[in-house]
Amino acid sequence: MKEKIPFYNEKEFNEMMKKTKKGTFSGWYIINPENNSVEFSGSFNRQFKLNKPIIPVNTEYVTRKEFNEYKDSNDQRLIKIETTLTAQGEQINKLTQTVEKQGEQIRELQVEQKAQGEQIKAQGETLKLILQTLQKMSDRLDKIDPPK
């Protein structure tokens, strides 16, 4: 199977200029691995355009250095995200602990309120008994000493 590789390296361009004695050109190297041959297909031009080859418009190439820089920056961004996530996880753990403590405090307060409610009920019952005894005493006093 033939492989097409775009041709736009400046060094290769200068070498091709020396060989062909022509100006600028654009095209493709066609590499045939079956017979280890390299062909050039494209258009040759006698006009010089600042001694630079014409780069195909539709293609974009990234150097290894640019790719590694992108990879490193992406890794650094991921590391930052991981550190923020771990920090947020720790904050969430602290918040859950405080919520659990507050829940225990609320339960203790509920128990205290129940105990106070029972005490108030008991005091109310004793007050009712005292009122009943006072009423009975006033009734007895009225029987002994009728009002005139």
Curated annotation (Swiss-Prot):
Signal peptide: none annotated. It comes from the Bacteria. Belongs to the UPF0134 family. This is UPF0134 protein MPN_410. Pfam families: DUF16 (PF01519). Coiled coil: none annotated. Gene3D superfamilies: 6.10.250.40. The lineage of its organism: Bacteria, Bacillati, Mycoplasmatota, Mycoplasmoidales, Mycoplasmoidaceae. It comes from Mycoplasma pneumoniae (strain ATCC 29342 / M129 / Subtype 1) (Mycoplasmoides pneumoniae).
